[in-house]
Amino acid sequence: LRNNSLAALCPALPEVQSYFRKVTERLIRDYDFDGSKMDYIFSVPRCYNPAHHHKSPDDSVRAVADVYKIILETSKALKPYSVTQICPCGTTPNLAWLPFENQAVTADPVGSIQVRRRIKLYKALLGPRSAVYGDHVELSKIRFDPNREVDLGEDFASTVGTGGVLGTKFTWPDYGNRFDDVFLTPRKEAIWKQWIPIYNSMMLSKGTFMNLYTIGYDSPEGYAIAKDGKMYYAFFVSEAQAWEGSLDLRGLEQGTYRVFDYVNQKELGSVDASSPRLQTKFTENLLLEVSRQ
């Protein structure tokens, strides 16, 4: 499909659906993979092949979801914990196949803002406890050179703080100039070693996304996750921008709460739910754990 160099199987054919069932069985059962990421091919053209005897050329388009359903159900039957992702590569998700993935993908975000807002989008569409992959953290900052895309992102906070599933595409050892932007240098390794344990220990991706802040209206940009009797807040401003003021910690039940900066391991005092305002300052982002005292 890309540059007319690829062909697509017609998903409306029973033979094609059977083929994908067998491929999935081979990958999950025989090769012991733990899931699938369907990348780039998230739709197909209309099919005008008379040998297929379609009632409509759109039969092929409608049947895409049937194939994804087969892949998801076959994977889960073989491995209940398997992950099925569908990546629409920078385009909007298709409502037809959304039910047939168990981990949505933010799909090639260009910068941190798109990571955060697409996570919120998917939480709205799929439910507040749905799993949403924040895509490779390297995509949180991108530079476009004349001949290639250079992925420079290190913004783990935009995925962790919004309740997304963390990911990275670092390379090691050094494979040369083609992958120099994603090579795990000693400097980057220190950052990765800070954030991955934070994600693994807190697992905010399994919490409940609370729709308490409105993008474009509330400033700074805010998110809230409820998990294990605690509230986790994340606030963001533009890159390298400093912010100072009073944060509104919404959604707290009656009582007094301890406020803790869990990234920098810093106590920030306490707030009362009757007036949950926190006077503070930060640069770029601030991630908080708020627990009842």
Language-model segments: residues:
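Active-site-adjacent "subsite" loops/lids of carbohydrate-active enzymes
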Residues: 1-30, 107
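Aromatic- and acidic-residue-enriched carbohydrate-binding clefts of CAZyme catalytic domains
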Residues: 1-15, 42-71
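Core alpha/beta catalytic barrel or barrel-like domain that forms the active/cofactor pocket
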Residues: 1-6, 34-46, 85-90, 131-132
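Active-site groove signature of glycoside hydrolases
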Residues: 19-53
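Short, well-ordered alpha-helical packing segments
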Residues: 21-28, 65-76
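Composition- and surface-driven signal marking solvent-exposed, interaction-prone regions
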Residues: 60, 245-249, 273-274
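Active-site-proximal substrate-binding groove within the catalytic cores of carbohydrate-active enzymes
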Residues: 68-266, 279, 284
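C-terminal beta-strand-rich structural cap/linker in extracellular carbohydrate-active enzymes
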Residues: 269-293
